[in-house]
Every structure is written in structure tokens, then in C-alpha cells.
Amino acid sequence: MPCEDGPVAKDERSKRSAAEAIAEAKVHAPTRGNKKLDKFLEAVNDDEQVRTWWYMAQMTSERLGMSDHSWVHVQVILNVALRLLRLLDKAGVEPAMVTDHGMKLRDAEVVVAGGALFHDVGMSIHRKDHEEFSLFLAADRLPELLADVYKEPSRTIVASETLNTIIGHRRRGEPYTVEGGVVRVADALDMAQGRSRIPFEGGQYGIHALSAAAIDEVRIEQGEERPVRIEIEMNNSAGVFQVDDLLATKLRGTPIEDKVEIVAQVKGETEKRLLPSFRVE
């Protein structure tokens, strides 16, 4: 699922102050009349500390030469996660908020939104073990951000389930819920053209960057054999590594593993030449 807004180039961003960059960090998603989700997103967008964490997460990714981890990445994951959850619900797959707590789909939407919004805030501190850092940052802010949305004990239930989605998105994470699986898979789907190829265009020619540059488009549709069908269009078969090493790994072992079908194919008759040569130093 492509995003209309792309990350701001580093040289362009450097012309602005940190305050200006943080001020523009506002996320949007189709709430479909979910007033709880509306209130939660409004609270997050109004929270300068959260938006500063997004700014600092991107700073860390730039220092390491990684793909975009700014608020744009957050917005992509937010929208993808909501789409996945709604497609699963349409097929009769109930989230934990419904099956375990007797709540509603709209509450599950708040949980996956929270997971998407906070899953990488720990990157503002350090890349290594950032999921754990995200946990303690989110644990401090979530209750306050949810204060106008839920009363106790619902507020703590929503916050706890959100924290489960955050820790579950790490590479060897074990999400116990549909919501956790949704956030984990959504995080791997920010790979459309202009997104994961950033390290490649920066001169990094390893297999991760090369395979990322091979991904042109990602489509998330209602499936026929399974509730969700993810179609990935590639310009080069090197993209298979990105699909299998990143996406398939994120999907395996989650409660939605058997609910999602992944199909990747190279478009056209010929493959795009991604680099002229490769030299091992």
C-alpha cells in the first residue's frame, strides 16, 4: 500500500529546525466513524513528546543508513494495520478485544493503532533492543492518551493489549493475539516503491538493500482462499529475499498466519537491472 507522502530528504530537512520538522508530524487514517479511534488519534497528534520521538527515531535511522522510520513510516503502518484488521473482521476473524474481553472491533482498532503509533518510538533511544525501549516509553504515555477515551478497567486492558503488539513486532516476537499479528505483519509491509529502497539509493548494495529496491508495489486485498491476499509486484526477482526474509518471517507463528496469502511476482517480460556490477572488497 503506497503512501502519498514520502520522507523528506535529509538535505531538505536539515534546512529546517527540529521544531519545524516535529510540528508537521501528524498522522491520519480512515476511522470510519470510530469515535474512540478519532479521540485517540487526536490526542496523539496533539502530543509533542510522541511526535518528537518519531523525529528522533528517524534521526537514528539516518545515522545508521536505514530505511525511513519517521512519522511517515508510522502513518503507513497505521493505515496498513487498520486495513488488515478490517479485512480479517469482514471474514469473521475476531480480535482478542472481542473474544477475550467482550469488547468491540472499534476497541481492537484502537489497540492496533496504538501498536502502529508506538512500535518504533524506542528507536529514539537506540536501534538495538528498541522494542523494549518502545515498551517503557509507551507504558508511560498510553494511559494519559487514553484517558479521554476509556475509563478503568477498560483503559488498562487497551493499554496492555497495545503493549503486547509492540513487543510482538520484534523479529523473534511471539504475539498472542490477532491484533499483535496484524501490527507485526503491517510493519513488514512498508516496502512499496520509494520506501525500502532508500538505503539502496544511498549506495548500499547488500542483499537487503538490493531486494528492497526490487519491490515496486504492495496491494492488500480481500482474498478468496484466505481472508487477506497480499500481492507484491517486483521489478526484479531479488525482491523474493525481501518477501521471504522479512514479510514471511514476520507472518510465521502469528495467530493470523493461516489467514493471509502472499503472492509475489515480477512484472513484465524482462527484469530491471538494479546494479551494473558487484565487487567484494
Feature map (PLM): residue ranges:
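Divalent metal-dependent phosphate-bond-processing catalytic cores, especially two-metal-ion Mg2+/Mn2+ enzymes
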Residues: 2-45, 63-68, 79-106, 118, ...
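N-terminal glycine-rich anion-binding loops that anchor highly charged ligand groups
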Residues: 45-56
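N-terminal low-complexity or amphipathic/hydrophobic leaders
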Residues: 56-76
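Active-site alpha-helix of zinc metalloproteases
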Residues: 111-115
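Catalytic acidic motif of RecA-like/P-loop NTPases
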Residues: 122
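Post-HEXXH active-site segment of zinc metalloproteases
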Residues: 127-140
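Membrane-interface starts of transmembrane alpha-helices
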Residues: 151-159
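An acidic, phosphate/nucleotide-engaging active-site surface
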Residues: 158-161, 167-170
